[in-house]
Amino acid sequence: MGPRAKAVCSLFILLQVLAEPAENSDFYLPGDYLLGGLFTLHANVKGTVHLSFLQVPQCKKYEMKVLGYNLMQAMRFAVEEINNRSDLLPGVLLGYEIVDVCYISNNVQPVLYFLAREDYSLPIQEDYSHYVPRVLAVIGPDNSESTTTVAHFLSLFLLPQITYSAISDDLRDKQHFPALLRTVAGADHQIEAMVQLLLHFNWNWIIVLVSSDDYGRYNSQLLNDRLATGDICIAFQETLPMPQPDQVVTEWERQRLEAIVGKLQQSSARVVVLFSPDLILHNFFREVLRQNFTGAVWIASESWAIDPVLHNLTELRQTGTFLGVTTQSVPIPGFSEFRIRRTPVRLPEPNRTSLEATCNQECDTCQDTTASFNSILMLSGERVVYNVYSAVYAVAHALHSLLGCTQACSKEVVYPWQLLKEIWKVNFTLLGHNVFFGQQGDVLMPMEVIQWQWDLSQNPFQSIASYYPKLRQLKAIHNISWHTANNTIPVSMCSKDCHPGQRKKPVGIHSCCFECIDCLPGTFLNRTADEFDCQPCPSYEWSHRNDTSCFKRRLAFLEWHEPSTIFVVMLTILGFLSTLAIMVIFWRHLHTPVVRSAGGPMCFLMLVPLLLAYAMVPMYIGQPTFFSCLWRQTFFTLCFTICISCITVRSFQIVCIFKMARRLPRAYGYWVRCHGPYVFVASFMVLKVVIVAGNVLATTANPTARPDPDDPNIMVLSCNYRRALLFNTSLDLLLSVAGFSFAYMGKELPTNYNEAKFITLCMTFYFTSSVSLCTFMSVYDGVLVTILDLLITVLNLLGISFGYFGPKCYMVLFYPERNTQVYFSSMIQGYTMGKD
């Protein structure tokens, strides 16, 4: 005997103790093909699953479930409506057998009854492909626990089961539940709708309360998984105690409820997400009212979102705003009248025996109870009711296709597995909604977020938003009446959201609890990338405090219209014109003693580069380019080196004539014969060219932008030769020191040859200004560096023009009597006689 046969054998033993249902028009309707219905008409708070007991529980002893009776009537209405149609199953009558499952207490007995034959036997066979059970399909039950139990039995026979409100995602496993389908979206969609609702109102600090059964644990785990990577934090999560079947509050339960509600009072969170069956919540909400806990937003799961009994506890309006996630309301024409219509009890049929009322097919108080709740049931709309209605129609359409109905149907034997294959294929429109089963066996009907209202003129469960499972999107949130002062949206945040440009500094273990810290200048906050760290701006950009982005810095360089530039340009023009005038004067008096003592033709070797240096001053003004930086780094410094080297060699030559010619006559002779001054200048020029070429190769001539330390909004655009500046001017500095030394040595020479004061002044100014500029540039990067660089350069040029050539021109122009050979000879003779 195989495992499957053994399982059926065990069921057969239990089946023998079960009785046939009592006759009742609400629970039984004969027909050519029967459907089974499992509904919760009565419910114990926590029923016991009687798998190990022979006695079947009597559901009528438990509390009446109004919604369960409402759903049962939907199945009856759908069957009778189909039987009255001529286009669907013509000539075929559907019947039903409906059983009260008492929530989870009475699951096994009904499914065994449905699987049995008309003679109440369930044979043990190896092949059930040609087995015909009492019913062709089962509608229900309503919760995931019961559905799982029933599905394990029905799947052995591939008997179709369509549940209308069991949302557990485990039921999508077709390897374990091949015969199970649903006309309701899964639990993941309920969670997604809740999360999107929380995000819409910026509620990132919530409390989660769950029941201690599988429903509470499963849904809370789904919520925790969904929030693991989100922006919503759970302040705390508590498990509600399971009440006693008689609803008497025990001391332990009372203390537990007091502690939970007290914790709610102390928490800063004001949004409570509650996953629990409705019967567990009565004692909890009584404790909430007793402690006068108010100002909360209650978010209900589908299990109690539209429960009329809880809604009838009108004092709950004082505790806050009630929102819930449930299925979409689809009005069913004629159903409201059918639901409250009392049907006379039919007498038992001759072929049916009235047995003991242990089969849970009676509800003495259903009619009276539903009549009292009829206004709420009518106004709440046919929500879950449509799920039952569409499930019956899905079976009818599948049977219509299987029987090959056109004008009439062939009433042949139908096996459950044949019907199951056809149910998977159905695709029809019912009351404006397309009904078909997806790959996971679900009909993705839209869901709604509802708000509880207690105003008699309004719908008690008013729709405020719609959720579309196919899009996984919550839309059209509107018409919410907040139970707060001035109808303001409640706030439930551990920390208020930071202002733009402020980063979050976490406080504690929750990412929703934080301090807001301003982003410093030069940094910005990119919330989409990282809310907890300010990002530095790129070097060419800047930001102010609390900026969310960086802006490009303004490029600063010497511009022609600036006062400092105009001043330097005027000095340059003065120097250029003065140098040009000096050239003219020296050219006209080239053979005079004054010009010859200044260097003669070598003066023009100084004046021409000096003019070129003045002419290249505009290279310092305007936006730097590669070529302007290259000219400044090469040709300008070469011109200046020529001038310095000429002054130095001239100072050395004068000292040689008066102090070394007599002591070293042969050396002096070589100096004169080999054109020592020109060789000296040429040698230093070659060395300078090597230095400049090395700098050009080692560094780039491209201009670079550096932040201005005085104004971070500015980027100073300048030539990139700062690192090479000291090395580039080292030769010039060495020449200036040598020139200064030789000039100092010649301070006792004849007056007309004594240039110590002027050369010393020029060389001292150049040395100190160059060293100071290099030092300043190494510690400061502002726009002032460029201005000082140009100003010092022009002043050095002016120092040579006026400091070295100025006195000569003054002598030539204003003291012509001293510019004679006789005067110079007398001065030399006087110096010689004085030395002797």
From Swiss-Prot:
GO terms for molecular function: 1-pyrroline-5-carboxylate dehydrogenase activity; G protein-coupled receptor activity. It comes from the Eukaryota. Residues 1-19 form the signal peptide. Keywords: Cell membrane, G-protein coupled receptor, Glycoprotein, Membrane, Receptor, Sensory transduction, Signal, Taste, Transducer, Transmembrane, Transmembrane helix. One of its GO terms (cellular component) is plasma membrane. GO terms for biological process: sensory perception of taste. Residues 20-565, 623-634, 702-724, 779-781 are extracellular. The keyword Transcription regulation does not apply. It is a multi-pass membrane protein. The chain crosses the membrane at residues 566-586, 602-622, 635-655, 681-701, 725-745, 758-778, 782-802. InterPro entries: ANF_lig-bd_rcpt (IPR001828), GPCR_3 (IPR000337), GPCR_3_9-Cys_dom (IPR011500), GPCR_3_9-Cys_sf (IPR038550), GPCR_3_C (IPR017978), GPCR_3_Ca_sens_rcpt-rel (IPR000068), Peripla_BP_I (IPR028082). Glycans are attached at residues 84, 292, 312, 351, 427, 479, 486, 526, 546. Belongs to the G-protein coupled receptor 3 family. TAS1R subfamily. This is Taste receptor type 1 member 2. The gene is TAS1R2.
